[in-house]
Design a protein with these regions (language model features):
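Intrinsically disordered, low-complexity N-terminal extensions of AAA+/P-loop NTPases
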Residues: 1-43
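Short, Lys/Arg- and Gly-enriched loop/turn segments at beta-strand edges
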Residues: 400-408, 420, 467-471
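SF2 helicase motor core recognition
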Residues: 401-408, 446-456, 479
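ASCE P-loop NTPase helicase motor core
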Residues: 121-124, 128-312
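Helicase C-terminal subdomain and adjacent C-terminal extension
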Residues: 263, 457-515
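Conserved helicase motor core of P-loop NTPases
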Residues: 252-393, 399-402, 413
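N-terminal pre-Walker A segment at the start of P-loop NTPase domains
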Residues: 103-120
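Interdomain "pre-motor" coupling segment immediately N-terminal to P-loop NTPase/helicase cores
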Residues: 43-104
Length: 515
């Protein structure tokens, strides 16, 4: 891609290699999740001389006036498409954020609202007053419970309110449906954002957009940190001018796989209704999981290591830098842990039982390949458990015809190795493996793929050298907070320190200097 862009720009500029290299580098940066490229003064001067390639855009430049393939805004270089996405998100969010109802929201004094903490009551009021709102908080802080109260309040005031629930993945949508139902919300099941928008069979356009907005009055999106800039722009285009939008997520989790850091940027934007829940009921504030998560976010590797080495029973640690082998078989207690933790799942005699036990335990890895990656660990677990047990399989591509989404997990039973069994409203359903686009074993998954999931216990594996660019604050925080019970960390002090000191940084222009 970089070479193709370089060649195109050289043709457009009559062989200007400096301009071609700058533009090609900007495109290459997109692969790292950046929306744009930050320029130095010399680069700005060079690009100012090629208006047919690079359009200099001001804050008021109409998007339709830009024809050049690249855009400079301030000291940032965009592809035209990315500039249009970001401009659209900024304008739509800004306009919606200014639409705030006057007066106070008085919640009824009944049992449905009485158990709300003060921070939750304030959040419900903010959501009910603002056309656009954000709710962020860690696991167990009551985000779903709070949203449910806001929904009830507005539906009581307007019984005809058309509500839609959505999430970036099928797995997250299923969890959202269950959580909202448990919290007392009566609504249609949550769908993936792509399904809500009506992705066309070309996979690049949607049925719903500016010319055909969604017939809803309020959209609530869970796991919003997983939404990239292009999808957020398309989502906003599909909302009519009066539609409410509430984004729910954990700002400390991993950013989207797609380019951008939209949820994180919006959580720092001035003028936006943002509520953050801090009190967790899942993890005691002085408990090991909460202490580690807080220390990771606080860039305090010494505190993380102190908790890990205390070996409380909730948290345990194996120092991979002191093992003699890179193979999992040589890691202290690893094989025994896998046999024990996967034991109940391995003994499942039918698909329903296996699916009920599939989230009892999961191995989470920062890497996909290599001795500390998902591929090697899945191979190892399959070998030690043997051929006679069920195998968890993850779907890795969306398929509308089969109604499956990237990230969905099912099981293959040993007596029926050609079918994948998946959870359904009525229990289970099965699909022949050859009818699915792509699958992979899921005893171990990447931490990225674990977003939106929770497990009774997890083991986290980090490469011990501490130099991988994937070792970030967000990767370790996300992995740790997937558990409802305990964590066993296979890592090293170097890899823990690398995670604590490095936060994900993506170059975007959504937050202006004055925002």
């Amino acid at each position: 891609m970089k070479n193709a862009v370089r060649d195109m720009v050289e043709r457009m500029t009559g062989g200007n290699t400096k301009v071609a290299e700058i533009c090609a580098s900007a495109v290459a940066d997109l692969e790292e999740g950046d929306v744009c490229r930050r320029l130095g003064e010399d680069e700005l001067r060079i690009l100012s001389e090629v208006s047919n390639v690079v359009h200099a855009a001001g804050d008021d430049t109409p998007a339709e006036d830009v024809m050049a393939p690249f855009v400079v805004s301030g000291n940032l270089l965009y592809t035209r498409r990315n500039w249009q996405y970001e401009r659209n998100v900024a304008e739509r969010i800004g306009r919606m954020s200014r639409n705030v109802s006057a007066g106070d929201v008085a919640l009824p004094d009944d049992e449905f609202y009485s158990l709300l903490r003060e921070e939750q009551r304030k959040t419900v009021a903010a959501m009910c007053k603002s056309q656009f709102s954000i709710l962020t908080g860690g696991p167990g802080t009551g985000k779903t419970h709070t949203v449910a109260r806001a929904v009830k309040f507005l539906k009581d005031a307007n019984p005809d309110l058309r509500l839609a629930l959505a999430a970036p993945t099928g797995k997250a949508a299923a969890r959202m449906t269950e959580s909202m139902s448990n919290a007392g919300v009566t609504a249609a099941p949550a769908t993936t954002i792509h399904s809500l928008l009506g992705v066309r069979y070309d996979q690049v356009s949607f049925r719903h957009g500016r010319e055909n907005p969604l017939p809803i009055d309020w959209l609530i999106v869970d796991e919003a940190s997983m939404i990239g800039m292009p999808l957020m722009s398309n989502l906003l285009d599909a909302l009519h001018d009066g539609c409410r939008l509430t984004l729910v997520g954990d700002v400390d989790q991993l950013a989207s796989v797609e380019r951008g850091h939209v949820f994180g940027d919006l959580c720092r934007m001035r003028g936006v209704s943002i509520s953050r829940l801090l009190e967790s009921t899942r993890f005691p504030p002085d408990g090991e999981i909460a202490r580690i998560a807080g220390a990771v976010n606080g860039n305090n590797p010494a505190e993380v290591m102190s908790v890990l080495r205390a070996e409380s029973g909730v948290v345990s640690y194996v120092d991979l830098s002191k093992t003699s082998s890179v193979a999992p078989a040589g890691w202290t207690g690893f094989a025994e842990m896998c046999r024990k933790r996967f034991g109940a799942f391995a003994d499942s005699g039918d698909p329903k039982t296996a699916l009920d036990r599939i989230n009892d335990f999961r191995i989470l890895c920062a890497l996909r390949h290599g001795p500390y990656g998902v591929d090697r660990l899945n191979e190892f677990v399959r070998k030690i458990l043997g051929r006679g047990c069920p195998e968890p399989m993850m779907i890795t591509q969306n398929d509308r015809l089969q109604d499956v989404a990237n990230g969905d997990i099912g099981v293959v039973m040993p007596d029926d190795p050609r079918r994948l069994h998946l959870p359904s409203v009525d229990g289970t359903r099965s699909i022949r493996l050859e009818c699915l686009p792509a699958t992979e074993p899921a005893f171990a998954t990447t931490i990225h793929k674990s977003q939106g999931s929770e497990f009774n216990d997890v083991a986290i594996v980090l490469p011990p050298d501490g130099v991988s660019p994937l070792l970030t604050r967000e990767i370790l925080y996300t992995g740790i907070t997937r558990t409802k019970g305990g964590v066993r960390l296979y890592a090293s002090e170097a890899s823990v320190e690398a995670c604590c000191i490095k936060a994900v940084e993506r170059v975007t222009g959504l937050i202006k200097p004055h925002s």
